[in-house]
Amino acid sequence: MFSEKANTIFQDVIKTYKVLNTVDQPFTNKYNKSDDLIAHLLYRKSWIDTVQWAYEDIIRDPNIDPVAALKLKRKIDASNQDRTDTVEFIDSYFLDKYKDVAAKANAKINSESPAWVIDRLSILALKIYHMHLETVRADASDAHKAACQTKLNVLLEQREDLSTAIDDLLTDISNGDKYMKVYKQMKMYNDDELNPVLRGQK
């Protein structure tokens, strides 16, 4: 199933990132886009999410230098744009894959495109990884670890449900029971024609 492939890639990305565990490390995609385009895109998507998770931790440091915080905020904005672009590339992959499928007369549209469901699955992998760390943290109290284990159990159940949902959605699209319709996110904050502050600097 697709979800099994995606979840395996997401876990591998996190494991690979944590070897050096720094936002400044170089990125190397383990998958060639000519050989396995969707794996290439999933790996890239998960890497963006993993680095941004670290960015969000760093910027919440109450002692962070304001200049460094501003620089990091710009990196987060760029990362968000990269994330959105990659999600749209993933949807383009599925649009192309299913372009010859004739939607049935009673076919319905899903509230989310496949790629945005995959986006949530990628973020969920990070939540599960970090919540698991809290359940085995040596300096944490038993109460803390127990509370985190309860949360982890919910996250694991959520991953199971979300994995089933994306597999069912792709099956429905491939059978013509549902059809894809993708809207670009139209993010405005990085566009110097749409952000009034940036526009005023031109």
Which residues fall in each region the model found?
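Anionic, Ser/Thr-rich low-complexity intrinsically disordered regions
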Residues: 1-202
